[in-house]
């Protein structure tokens, strides 16, 4: 009984630590891309092209499961906005929805026997679809003009380098840390 309680405490501690690390990475990594944008004169282009905040969400979800992924996805954009003003207030709720879905879906697929790239792709499709639905509801249902429905397709096109980065980097990272799975199960 005591071993079981000790093990459960270890799992909770590992998941809490992973959540904090995931949120930290999801807030810090985009700042590097913003600095690159400032130095190169491209502004926010590197951030919107490479989608750096998404990496931490996918990684923590695939490592520690759906609760960790969903919390990381919901909190990261909110904390980033509070600290840096990015993403913009208009995009914040939609990004929170999208990243929460990413974290939840990837976390639910964590132990499924399928390639990492398919787990990520499934989460990307569902996350973008739900984000698109939220944008359409805001625009047509609530008559909000803060975000136009044209952003749905334009963000996919501009974020293609980030999607490719996620498809290549995440399987490699998870392969490198596969021994850490013992801390979450």
Name the predicted role of every residue range.
Residues 34-47, 51, 85-93, 112-185:
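Membrane-embedded alpha-helical hairpins and interfacial helices in multi-pass inner-membrane proteins
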Residues 71-108:
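Helix-adjacent hinge/juxtasegments
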Residues 16-21, 55, 66, 70-74, ...:
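Hydrophobic alpha-helical transmembrane segments
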């Amino acid at each position: 009984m005591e071993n079981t309680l000790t093990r459960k405490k270890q799992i909770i501690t590992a998941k809490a630590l992973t959540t904090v690390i995931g949120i930290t990475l999801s807030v810090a990594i985009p700042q590097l891309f913003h600095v690159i944008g400032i130095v190169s004169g491209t502004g926010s282009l590197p951030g919107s092209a490479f989608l750096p905040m998404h990496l931490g969400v996918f990684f923590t979800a695939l490592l520690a499961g759906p609760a960790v992924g969903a919390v990381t996805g919901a909190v990261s954009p909110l904390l980033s906005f509070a600290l840096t003003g990015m993403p913009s207030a208009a995009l914040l709720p939609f990004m929170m929805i999208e990243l929460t879905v990413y974290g939840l879906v990837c976390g639910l697929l964590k132990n499924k026997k399928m390639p990492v790239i398919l787990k990520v792709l499934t989460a990307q499709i569902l996350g973008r679809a739900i984000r698109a639905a939220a944008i359409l509801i805001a625009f047509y249902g609530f008559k909000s003009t803060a975000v136009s429905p044209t952003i749905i397709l334009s963000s996919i096109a501009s974020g293609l380098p980030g999607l490719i980065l996620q498809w290549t980097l995440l399987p490699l990272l998870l392969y490198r840390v596969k021994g850490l799975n013992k801390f979450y199960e």
